[in-house]
């Protein structure tokens, strides 16, 4: 998750560069390597929360060509996550369709890339970071949910779904 294994060498422009990068990753991680076409453009994310719907988006602005694992996990001044509303209502409908077609349970972060006024689906991620300043929480805040609101909601829904609410004594904390 979080683009682990990705860095500035991950964007390649020739077969030789591709081969070198794939071999390096196979040696380092000893597992399959996913290769995708690179699409230039603006990164943005939305989230889906079952029972609430599509929230966000948040737009990632960073000084680097690639928003890598380190930037996602160690926040600094090179990354600015902005929120915006307005032009994204149609994208929210697309997120709802994705959630329905993939039968997403619980929650997911859906990443897009915008190029020439077109949105390209990059990935659907069900293993998201709940870092208070990360994309998932920032998207929730766009639609008025606080960190505590969204975390408590997700935990409560998960416990209801798994019928464990009373067996472990979980209690939602009121703010």
Regions flagged by a language model, labelled:
Residues 15-87, 93, 114, 118-120:
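Phosphate-binding site of ATP-dependent enzymes
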Residues 87-175:
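ATP-dependent carboxylate activation and anion-phosphoryl transfer catalytic cores
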Residues 12-15, 144:
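Conserved aromatic
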Residues 5-6, 78-79, 131-136:
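Short small-residue beta-strand/loop micro-motif enriched in glycine and branched aliphatics
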Residues 12, 39, 130:
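Hydrophobic pocket-lining residues within nucleotide cofactor-binding pockets
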Residues 1, 25, 37-38, 99-103:
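Short Gly/Pro-enriched turn/cap motifs at secondary-structure boundaries
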């Amino acid at each position: 998750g979080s683009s682990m294994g990705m860095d500035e060498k991950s964007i390649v422009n020739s077969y030789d560069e591709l081969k070198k990068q794939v071999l390096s990753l196979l040696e380092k991680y000893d597992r399959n390597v996913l290769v995708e076409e690179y699409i230039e453009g603006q990164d943005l994310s939305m989230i889906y929360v079952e029972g609430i719907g599509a929230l966000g988006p948040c737009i990632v602005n960073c000084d680097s060509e690639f928003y890598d694992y380190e930037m996602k996990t160690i926040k600094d001044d090179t990354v600015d996550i902005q929120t915006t509303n307005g032009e994204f209502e149609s994208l929210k409908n697309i997120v709802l369709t994705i959630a329905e077609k993939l039968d997403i349970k619980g929650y997911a972060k859906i990443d897009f890339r915008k190029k020439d006024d077109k949105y390209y689906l990059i990935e659907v991620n069900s293993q998201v970071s709940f870092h208070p300043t990360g994309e998932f929480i920032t998207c929730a805040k766009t639609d008025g949910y606080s960190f505590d609101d969204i975390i408590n909601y997700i935990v409560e829904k998960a416990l209801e779904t798994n019928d464990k609410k009373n067996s472990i004594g979980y209690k939602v904390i009121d703010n």
